[in-house]
């Protein structure tokens, strides 16, 4: 038995007849749980999930990776998780951005060398799982004893994913007890565009706009070195029909206030920024907008 609970009362989890105090006293592990979602902080959803985790895995530290991602934007959250996972403590990752909640999309748990990933099978987990070396085992979470009974099907973060993450974090259950194994190659991938080199130009797109208005692209420094561009040079950045002459520098302090710059960001990709301002507004950029970089041509022109 993995779970004892009621629709209106989470109850007390037990395992092999051990009382909670006995189990915790001898528990061999307490993995940290890294929690990411699009729940925001205006409602009780994040707090309720924390409550479930605290009841079922009271010794596990919970790290909030972020909850302010655009609602239902799987790509945005998946990229954030991929950027973050190498800096998170090994343990359990609970990720919930689930526009397909209540449909036939699978709820999954994946075991990797880093630890466990728990969430919907909609591409959210795939890049991060690949980043840490791939999954050794993946299961479809179907065991009702590992879930909170619920009158509705719209809060799987609370009822399905949080209990599974807590059981794995506390060692209360093995991944094979959550449901049947599925082939790793059956996981829904996250389709991401690749850069394309056309002569002396590298075409990519804006991947992420952070709270400061900095715009991360999917273009790596190696992409530009292949066309003879490198730090210290001035490049031409084309967004739509507008062309900008932008210095490739190391830090914001290398340009004057209000000036546009390009630099290698904290995860190793090229980003556009404005010292003391917002590059997304200055360059009219948002996630998914095409960006092309070539050698310098001229100053900003329409």
What annotation goes with each model-predicted range?
Residues 30-68:
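N-terminal glycine-rich anion-binding loop in soluble enzyme alpha/beta folds
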Residues 15-28:
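Short, Lys/Arg-enriched N-terminal segments with co-localized hydrophobic residues
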Residues 218-283:
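A conserved acidic, glycine/proline-rich C-terminal tail/linker
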Residues 44, 48, 57, 72, ...:
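Conserved active-site and cofactor/substrate-binding residues in soluble primary-metabolism enzymes
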Residues 149-223, 227-228:
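Anionic-ligand-binding alpha/beta catalytic cores of soluble enzymes and soluble regulatory domains
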């Amino acid at each position: 038995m993995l779970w004892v609970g009621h629709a209106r009362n989470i109850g007390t989890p037990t395992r092999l007849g051990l009382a909670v105090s006995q189990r915790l006293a001898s528990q061999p592990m307490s993995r940290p749980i890294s929690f990411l979602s699009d729940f925001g902080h205006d409602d009780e959803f994040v707090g309720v999930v924390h409550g479930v985790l605290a009841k079922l895995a009271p010794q596990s530290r919970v790290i909030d990776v972020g909850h302010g991602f655009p609602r239902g934007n799987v790509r945005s959250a998946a990229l954030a998780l991929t950027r973050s996972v190498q800096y998170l403590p090994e343990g359990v990752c609970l990720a919930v951005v689930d526009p397909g909640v209540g449909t036939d999309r699978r709820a999954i748990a994946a075991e990797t060398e880093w630890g466990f990933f728990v969430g919907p099978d909609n591409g959210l987990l795939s890049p991060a799982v690949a980043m840490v070396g791939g999954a050794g085992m993946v299961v479809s979470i179907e065991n009702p004893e590992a879930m909170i009974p619920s009158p509705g099907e719209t809060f799987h973060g609370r009822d399905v994913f949080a209990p599974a993450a807590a059981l794995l974090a506390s060692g209360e259950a093995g991944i094979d007890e959550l449901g049947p194994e599925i082939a790793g190659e059956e996981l829904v991938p996250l389709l991401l565009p690749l850069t394309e080199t056309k002569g002396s130009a590298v075409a990519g797109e804006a991947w992420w706009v952070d709270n400061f208005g900095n715009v991360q692209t999917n273009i790596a420094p190696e992409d530009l070195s292949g066309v003879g561009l490198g730090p210290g040079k001035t490049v031409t950045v084309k967004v739509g029909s507008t062309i900008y002459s932008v210095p490739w520098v190391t830090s914001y302090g290398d340009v004057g206030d209000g000036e546009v710059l390009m630099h290698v960001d904290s995860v190793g990709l090229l980003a556009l920024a404005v010292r003391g301002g917002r590059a997304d507004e200055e360059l009219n950029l948002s996630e998914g907008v095409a960006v092309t970089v070539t050698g310098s041509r001229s100053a900003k022109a329409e």
